[in-house]
């Protein structure tokens, strides 16, 4: 039984025909991860869009390029305003928290709450030691998680989609050694590339034997 299918890129909205195919084959179960730089098309049987946001406008543009935040903002608002009263339910925000944007989490929530249904967060998972984007386990990371939990308890109870228990897990290594998953439930998700080859050890890994692997012991809990 397939609970959900998530289509990632590259950029899936460069191939709306492929997105439409997934929506038809897995009605109300297909999610699309997009940077929002292309117009968001209304697909009848799509579950929802995950729109990647990397901070407030300044931080997002620093990471993704000048003007990208405004372009994504316009495409999201256009979709919501042109597709009926409940169109906002089709849009979820995905924020990958890293060393450059961790101070903007509240601002991201405030910026996007009025136009989207939910936000889901994860932490950047490095592929090498010393990755400058990795926010190390410790005081600053704990503070981010605690802030999210507090926001979830108060005004954003129905907006932050991560359960409290999952947020707590993000404070520490919870199941990996080096690039090897140990307690991670990778069995729950089948990740394949565009050729149908299984990606290992998880969806952010690769099917290529000699490719770099994510550092499981510093996992950002992006999938689970």
Which positions does each model-derived feature cover?
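Conserved alpha-helical substructure of the radical SAM core
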Residues: 1-45
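Short, glycine/acidic-enriched loop or turn micro-motifs at the edges of active sites
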Residues: 14, 38, 55-57, 204
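A general structural signal marking secondary-structure boundaries and capping sites
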Residues: 16, 83-84, 223
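Generic recognition of cysteine residues
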Residues: 31, 184, 202-203, 223
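A sequence-level detector of short linear motifs
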Residues: 40, 200-201
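Radical SAM enzyme [4Fe-4S]-AdoMet core and its adjacent flexible, acidic
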Residues: 47-187, 192-198, 206-211
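Radical SAM enzyme core and accessory elements
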Residues: 206-224
């Amino acid at each position: 039984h397939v609970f959900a299918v998530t289509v990632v890129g590259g950029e899936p909205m460069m191939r709306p025909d492929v997105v439409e195919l997934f929506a038809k084959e897995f009605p109300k179960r297909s999610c699309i991860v997009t940077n929002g730089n292309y117009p968001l098309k209304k697909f009848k049987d799509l579950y929802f869009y995950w729109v990647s946001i990397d901070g407030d406008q300044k931080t997002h543009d620093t990471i993704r390029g000048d003007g990208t935040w405004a372009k994504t903002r316009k495409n999201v608002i256009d979709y919501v305003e042109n597709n009926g009263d409940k169109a906002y339910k089709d849009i979820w925000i995905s924020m990958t928290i890293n060393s450059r944007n961790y101070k903007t989490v509240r601002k991201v929530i405030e910026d996007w709450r009025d136009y989207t249904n939910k936000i889901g967060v994860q932490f950047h998972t490095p592929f090498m030691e010393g990755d400058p984007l990795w926010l190390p386990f410790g005081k600053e990371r704990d503070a981010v998680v605690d802030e999210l939990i507090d926001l979830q308890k108060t005004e954003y109870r129905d907006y932050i989609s991560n359960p409290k228990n999952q947020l707590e897990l993000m404070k520490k290594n919870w199941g990996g050694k080096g690039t090897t998953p140990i307690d991670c439930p990778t069995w729950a998700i089948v990740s394949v590339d565009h050729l149908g080859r299984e990606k290992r050890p998880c969806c952010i890994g690769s099917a290529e034997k000699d490719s770099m692997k994510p550092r499981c012991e510093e996992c950002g809990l992006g999938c689970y």
